[in-house]
Design a protein with these regions (language model features):
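Charged, alpha-helical interface segments at or near domain boundaries
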Residues: 18-157
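Short glycine-rich, basic-tinged beta-strand/loop micro-motifs
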Residues: 144-150, 181-189
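C-terminal structured domains
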Residues: 174-179, 186-239
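Short amphipathic alpha-helix segments
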Residues: 157-171
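Short Lys/Arg-rich cationic patches that frequently serve as NLS/NoLS or arginine-rich RNA/DNA-binding motifs
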Residues: 1-22
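Short amphipathic alpha-helical segments
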Residues: 115-119, 160-161, 195, 199
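Short, surface-exposed loop and linker segments with low hydrophobicity and enrichment for Pro/Ser/Thr
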Residues: 81-85, 168-175
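Hydrophobic, Leu/Ile/Phe/Ala-enriched alpha-helical segments that form helix-helix packing faces
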Residues: 123, 127, 131, 168-173, ...
Length: 239
C-alpha cells in the first residue's frame, strides 16, 4: 500500500471514530454567468446526511456513471474507479447526494467486495430508472439560427450519460438518427443528424467554455437504440 493510500485509509478511520465528515476545499476557476452551481454550505449539508461508513447496500441505489471532465482534478483528490465501455467511452462512478457526487474509488470497491462490472450494471440500471421519470415537457425545443436544437437538462449531473442507455434515450429524444452533444454533465443537446459539424463544435464550445467542469469535446450519434462516437476536433472544447 502506497503512502497516499495508507494516509487516506487512516483519515477515513479517524472520521469514523469522530463520527463526522471533514471537508477540504480546492478552489477552481470561476463559472460563467449562465452556470448555476451549489454553494459550499449546500454540499456540506448534503454530506452530513450521509452515513460515515458508505456500505454498498446503502449507496447502491444512488450510484450513477459519470463522464470525466476535461480539467484535471486536484492531485489530493481520491483516484477514480474507471472503466471503458462501448463505443470506447471512459466512465467513472459517483454517489449522487443531490448537489454533488461522492467519487467511487478503487479502494471503496475493494472494501465493498464489488467488482467494476457489477458497479457498472447497477449504475446503468439506476440511470435508466431516472430516465423513466423524464417527461416530454422536460425537453426544450428551440433553434439556433436555422438549426433545430432540443435541450434536456437534469437536476443532477446525470443527463450527459443518458447516451449510455440509447434505447431509453430514444424514448425521450425519438428513435431517429440524431447528433447529440454533452458539453456539461447535466446537459444534453440534440441536433439533426445532418447538422454542420463545425456548427456543432462551435455550439459545444460556447456552452462548455462557461463551465470549468466541462466534458471532453465529442459528439454522439444515436438512433434505433444504437450509439456511436464522433470527434469534434482538437481546436474545440474548453480544456
Amino acid at each position: 500500500m502506497g503512502r497516499n493510500q495508507r494516509e487516506r485509509k487512516q483519515e477515513r478511520e479517524r472520521r469514523k471514530q469522530e463520527r463526522r465528515w471533514t471537508a477540504r476545499v480546492f478552489e477552481g476557476p470561476p463559472t460563467g454567468p449562465d452556470v448555476v452551481t451549489p454553494s459550499f454550505q449546500e454540499v456540506v449539508a448534503a454530506l452530513e446526511t450521509m452515513p460515515q461508513e458508505l456500505t454498498w447496500d446503502q449507496i447502491a441505489p444512488e450510484v450513477v456513471p459519470l463522464f470525466q471532465r476535461v480539467r484535471p482534478y486536484h492531485p489530493e483528490m481520491p483516484e477514480q474507479l474507471r472503466m471503458v465501455v462501448p463505443p470506447g467511452l471512459s466512465v467513472g462512478f459517483g454517489v449522487d447526494i443531490g448537489p454533488a457526487f461522492i467519487t467511487v474509488s478503487p479502494e471503496m470497491a475493494d472494501e465493498w467486495g464489488i467488482g467494476p462490472d457489477e458497479i457498472l450494471e447497477r449504475a446503468l440500471a439506476n440511470l435508466e430508472a431516472r430516465m423513466d421519470g423524464v417527461r416530454p415537457r422536460d425537453v426544450y425545443d428551440g433553434s439556433i439560427g436555422d438549426v433545430p436544437v432540443r435541450m434536456l437538462q437534469s437536476p443532477t449531473g446525470s443527463a450527459s450519460t443518458y447516451v449510455l442507455v440509447p434505447d431509453a434515450l430514444g424514448r425521450i429524444f425519438g428513435t431517429h438518427r440524431q447528433l447529440v452533444l454533452a458539453p456539461m454533465r447535466n446537459l444534453l443537446l440534440s441536433l439533426p443528424i445532418g447538422a454542420d459539424r463545425d456548427f456543432a463544435a462551435w455550439l459545444f464550445d460556447e456552452i462548455a467554455s462557461q463551465d470549468p467542469n466541462c466534458l471532453a469535446p465529442a459528439a454522439f450519434v444515436i438512433g434505433d437504440g444504437q450509439l456511436s462516437l464522433e470527434p469534434l476536433g482538437e481546436s474545440y472544447g474548453a480544456a
